[in-house]
């Protein structure tokens, strides 16, 4: 039986969670018991918070339309008040000073907070980190995607933010999610940084020796895709990463399709793991572009 392109896309969307979970990942950061409070404007430091407003784009109807998803999303919908997010806002942040950039992080595990070694990287680049908790690979892709959109909206409401410096990044299964979001939402995210996991709307080999070429999510509308192709997109893998070939092939496919600011970082000695602070900073700097 030969499946149509649409049927293959829908099948992939339904199995996204199990594929991501099977490929997995890293341990969460050590942080003990943390209680989340409602987000407060301009709070600095490393903390968990509850956000207040759903993004219009994270509703089931709007999200389903954007991704041409024919299934029932209602059973996967979520209550934002029951969710929490890890944030890191550098201590030098000043609401009266220069606006900060944002990295929305999609984790493969249930802790969305920043690893301690990355704090100086964010301090130096005037960036805020925000990542949903309880949004690892075991969770359906719809709430994972929706929570990232909610994160982008709320951090912009409560902080002084440069809208041209709101990015999305993720690791392993979260890297796949970040690629999908960066390409499908160039009106929300100014670029994407996918680490040891990436996905595409283009047709690539689904597995070694399969001989089958399939897209992994629907092609975005032409106006959005045109904008995505002009934004920075960074893919990071390593010599010991079991997703290395897929990352290489996917990055090459994006470049062939006209992504003009595509960067593949292939780190010698890096496995399927969180990169060092030095290598993470390299990816961020490609995302941010040269200083003004």
Could you tell me what each predicted segment is?
Residues 7-18:
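Bacterial N-terminal signal peptides
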Residues 23-100, 252, 262, 292:
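A domain-start/cap signature at the N-terminus of enzymes
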Residues 91-98, 140-173, 183-188:
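Gly/Ser-rich "nucleophile elbow"/oxyanion-hole loop immediately N-terminal to the catalytic nucleophile
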Residues 97-109:
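Short beta-strand element of the alpha/beta-hydrolase
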Residues 113-130:
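Short amphipathic alpha-helix adjacent to the substrate-entry channel of hydrolases
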Residues 164-226:
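Primarily recognizes the serine-hydrolase "nucleophile elbow" in alpha/beta-hydrolase
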Residues 200-282:
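The feature captures the conserved acid-bearing segment of alpha/beta-hydrolase catalytic domains
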Residues 279-292:
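Catalytic active-site module of serine/aspartate enzymes centered on a nucleophile-bearing elbow/loop
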